[in-house]
């Protein structure tokens, strides 16, 4: 019996391993796996259903069909275990060996493995240095290849056609050896001397100069070295033995009616075996060559189809015209082994049901239907019934539960007490999509959910379903309670704001309760306290909104924890006094002494959490919810059609707009504006009119006239239900009310362009047929978009998770002094994100100095919490250098100090926290939300009127950056530079406002001049881009030939003519090479030079430009020579946004990127070619100049003689992140990506902490390219993991050798995921075949560092609670590797001995 137990134990024990290696299998290895050769294509006997001998399901090879029973039935039962039956040859053992025993097929002719042949770049082709086409022709028996040239003039690896081969045979006889088919390739591979080849190539590499050749050689060297180091033999890429998958992994299942359902693999194997047997027979018969060849080709094709069907030629189809699923298809794709079974599995002990609202639940509870609980907790109930002696056996317990006896319900209650369950709502977009609750048994069949967690789940009660999971083990329950309980997840991991925030009705109730009303019943009472206020209200002596005086005692707790009491009589309302009763002690009364909208409530909970901690906040949140619901019901806020008050001014606003539009129409007809300008102006007029109507409507809705106690009429905030809902943030928004009571406004077509006739009606007035039809456009687009975009957003999240999954906090401090500079985000006249919000929760990288002094305000390595941020604000600090994950020096993972505060917990981050996944979820989750947002507005085009001026808001002085300008005739400045920035500086030298000033803008004030608030400092036309001259003189047309490069358009009505430049695409042959331009000449006809340069003033005109001047006209500096109509901008929403975010994270190069200066120096222009200019930058120190050819149509931002810094913009356009990294460094590219991504989310009002984006950027920057290898084993131009380069360099530095120099690479997230060190992680992401082929050839080891690899091999992940387990394993491994000679004194030894002896007791022997 004992050895039986030992045997069973051995069955369950898994091998301890630290890494997984993948390599090519040699024929001997395949044979060693195999339990026998499969010789026949038969599967099972159709009469007896027993497997055929030597067939694909043979019991002798693969094991018995029934447990411990041989096929003929001679040996049965356990006592014969291990006996091999002499009659049928089957070993008596468990059936499950049929899942692990493999067979093999001896191939009659070698066959190439299609993965190494066709997966690009072809490994066989690269190794032999032959083109893939040639190899394929040899393999599929179309041509010969020379294997040994001998003494002839034939080269090895030379391809011969049939005729050439016969000629050579005649000429040389058997001097040479040429073959066809896989044997030939196998022979070539076998004869290769890898090491010698490697030496040769390395010599060649040092000699060549051409870049392409170097690249090719490096690739070959890497492949050859991989073969040498991994111990793989090249000839193993050609199969001589084919392994056969265990039969239970390709089952054959009998269906009723005598038919069978079979795995496609059986068909594919059958094909291989049939062809192989036929080939053997033909070879035995010595059949004619052509027949044998054909059979060999067919065998090759059959093996190809088995390994990867459809990779070459047409896919082999089954009986139902569907391609058969080959081995490669089994592992790749969403339904493949990796993503279907290894990364996510279905679980038992789970159920799902519809959710309904549970407003009486506490935050940590959920309502679980009794029926469901009974089913989910069955085993626990059985156990309890037996324990109590109420049931003797499990069977009896089962019967009791089935009968649903009364005692069962009592026991269910006991079992469920304190046993948390997990609730999950699909799609689980971030970690708050699964939370733990304590179940409360309820009648009915729907799960009840606490309303406050709806925001985290993004759940609503319109039919959503949720799944329930039961954590079974004690550890799982502990984790669920400590980490996943809904009460522990109050703050959102994306931005650190509370996510358990009242919304909808609760907000309405609290808002209604805290509003005040003029002359309400009971105004002016003086009450002794909140309790009395409540009594007065309940007795009906005072209204909820009455303004009264109440005596309030506050217990104010500062963040340091000091408590001060103060009592005072405060002017407030009855409702606020009642609400004060549920506010926890420690918060000031001022927090509720205001009308509470959604923002105020969120701030209130946040303050509560920061000052009082978790428990009071949870209780407070619950109380606010109950109170909110109660008073929302009391308020009786309802919506009637009369609540949608249409403003009286609406008609006149629309009339004015219509007049303006008519005016523009006239201008268009008289040729003053182009069609595009007209369209844009019309749209702007209507957008502005819409804004005005909306403003009038909101003013109308938001106030009402009332009579106060003294009989005087005064205005108060309105109690209109619709207004209250929008104002509190409970339901609806100004944009939606505008559609109800203002005008619907402009609508968008499905392609995003705006229809220029707006819908002037609103929903209260009703739409006519045309208006209704126009609006259906937008509404349907919204629905279609949502369906398409949700998938895109999900895919973005998946890529982000994949690239960041192995980033974990691994140490406390890496000790770096580097960091990134944080400044407030200022856009236009408003601070979009103040400094405090950006640095809160970060660690300072340097001491922060008090401005204007030398005092240290904040020391280095301080975690900036709320008080520190207050201090920074008080001292008006403008810039802080904080630690960032991008500059963290930890090798694998990051350190806690570089990350800073754990946003969801509010303290510094713990070791083992999976920050990568959190970052990915935080960025990806809103993406999906945003795609859903669009259809709720119903297609109304949200587009701001185009900006045409800059109006400053504050007092201060102007500062212009990167500016060039000329004075025009009126003494105004005209801007001629393209990325000019205008800043407003206050008296402390802080930037208050910041604006972009476009080219051609006219400035009213210059650099350094003082302005007062509200002053307009710049004007421009938003719809055209002017061409401004910098010099005075006369116009001379160049290359402007009517009919070839330009057309004249004369207006019939006015007789005015304008010249339009043709787009180069529309020009005829001779016009294509001409460059239309305007030159400026002086009175003598000499070219006028641009001041400060020796370049003639000439302005190239891009296509579609309109010139309204004639040849020879006199002009002055600053005049507009021509206009280029700007394309209309479409609607602004996240559609533009999500793909933009994806582009940024994929680090895509924009189409026509900005050209940046490669080095610092002085600009000059060299010799021009036909279509390009030569830009020369000469460094100031006199070293070599840098030259670049730039197309002439690119607008240059620099002039001759100007000094530029490396990385400055030379020619405008969208910047390429790769250029920014190369020229300005890591921090600049981080800043660029962070700001651009934040821009998109900010537009939608979504807050994401910068940290998360930085985490992704760090992962994008994890590779470097070796510039010079030094003494390392790297190759020049090789791409390697930064951590590997750093470790290698540290080692070399310690030994005093030459280190490698490298440049950082920016990889897009898809590329970065596929380029990870771990092949398991990459293979389970995308392009599985390619990744595995590459890994196998190189014999890669996967160290199982990331999360994904560990999930796939079935271990705890090295993060969170699994972090300790992995640290422990690492320590054990190091201890076993390094034998230490202990140096101990005798006393210590005896003490230790005693300790060991004592500790030895009570330990199990397997620990």
UniProtKB/Swiss-Prot annotation:
Its EC number is 2.7.7.6. It catalyses: RNA(n) + a ribonucleoside 5'-triphosphate = RNA(n+1) + diphosphate. It holds the Pfam family RNA_pol_Rpb1_2. One of its GO terms (molecular function) is DNA-directed RNA polymerase activity. One of its GO terms (biological process) is DNA-templated transcription. Disulfide bonds: none annotated. Gene3D superfamilies: 1.10.132.30, 1.10.150.390, 1.10.1790.20, 1.10.40.90, 2.40.40.20, 2.40.50.100, RNA polymerase II, clamp domain, RNA polymerase Rpb1, domain 3. GO terms for cellular component: DNA-directed RNA polymerase complex. Zn(2+) 1 binds at residues 70, 72, 85, 88. Its cofactor is Mg(2+); Zn(2+). The keyword Hydrolase does not apply. Mg(2+) binds at residues 460, 462, 464. Keywords: DNA-directed RNA polymerase, Magnesium, Metal-binding, Nucleotidyltransferase, Transcription, Transferase, Zinc. Binds 1 Mg(2+) ion per subunit. InterPro entries: DNA-dir_RpoC_beta_prime, DNA-dir_RpoC_beta_prime_bact, RNA_pol_asu, RNA_pol_N, RNA_pol_Rpb1_1, RNA_pol_Rpb1_3, RNA_pol_Rpb1_3_sf, RNA_pol_Rpb1_4. Zn(2+) 2 binds at residues 814, 888, 895, 898. The RNAP catalytic core consists of 2 alpha, 1 beta, 1 beta' and 1 omega subunit. When a sigma factor is associated with the core the holoenzyme is formed, which can initiate transcription. DNA-dependent RNA polymerase catalyzes the transcription of DNA into RNA using the four ribonucleoside triphosphates as substrates. NCBIfam families: rpoC_TIGR. Belongs to the RNA polymerase beta' chain family. This is DNA-directed RNA polymerase subunit beta'. The gene is rpoC.
